[in-house]
Amino acid sequence: MILETKKRNKNEESIPNKTTSNLNLKIKKMSKNIILSNQEIEHTIKRIAYQIYETFVEEDEIVIAGITANGFIFAQKITEALKNISPLKVSLCEVKMNKQNPELPIHTSLTKEQYTNKGLVLVDDVLNSGTTLIYAVRHFLDVPLKKFKTAVLVNRNHKKYPVKADFKGISLSTSSLEHVQVVFDEKGDSYAYLS
């Protein structure tokens, strides 16, 4: 009888369940140095959306341009928040560029005509050295814009280029050896961490 109970317990332990996978995710997150929780990211998105609306309140239409991957996801979230709080017509644009080699051509999901003479906010998740952001800024300077601003979730103070974020979630003074990563999770478990 005791033997059967042990076998049953061994079988139960080997079957992963939802609780076990959630626990594993929490353990992985705990081993990282979390700097922004999901709730803090959601609050930051709303705050930045209000700041953008205040800046562009006299415009009828603006473009939110997010740099591929996390910058674009962050831009989508800001766009959604802006649509909920303002009457502005908000267009979303994906900025496709090679972050390892930013000198390569940059492509956008909108044509130049679609953002010419409009207000534009360029969005990325983390402003590290400023390389990605400055090359993306340069791309948009080829056309006249009414206003041009930048937004980042995390602003680090180790820039190589004279570029700044007009709207930022948090600013960090870290060593140049530390890296900031942002994880956007569709299940509502997004976070930013220092590694």
Model-assigned labels for residue ranges:
Residues 1-12, 16-195:
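PRPP-associated nucleotide enzymes
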